[in-house]
Amino acid sequence: MIEAPFSLDFDRLEQGARVRSRGRTITESDLVSFSALTGDWHPQHADVAWAAESSFGERIAHGMLVLSYALGLLPIDPDRVVALRGIRNVVFKRPVPIGTTIRVETWSLLEPSA
């Protein structure tokens, strides 16, 4: 079994080491709960009839909901990671309809400091 990149010391990391997370299936309850928590009741997420006529043809998860779940799927050792300082280059490549199972794949990109 490969150890998660976030749990290894820098000198034990191998370039390109990959880890794939467990899955998380997006449910209707997830969309409703996220809408209630954030106040984002856009009909693409909340209105079945409206979403059926949209370019996606159905309700889809909020991008930030998917991103939040993706972060929760990361294999992070709480003794090593103290805080999230930022996220670079987040791109939402395709819609995530209800019933979709998401997974996160992480890999090591080693950039030694000067």
Put a short name on every predicted segment.
Residues 1-61:
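Catalytic strand-loop segment that frames the active site of acyl-thioester-processing enzymes
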Residues 1-15, 20, 92, 96-114:
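HotDog/MaoC-like acyl-thioester-processing domains
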Residues 52-111:
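Hydrophobic beta-strand-centered segment that forms part of the acyl-chain substrate-binding groove
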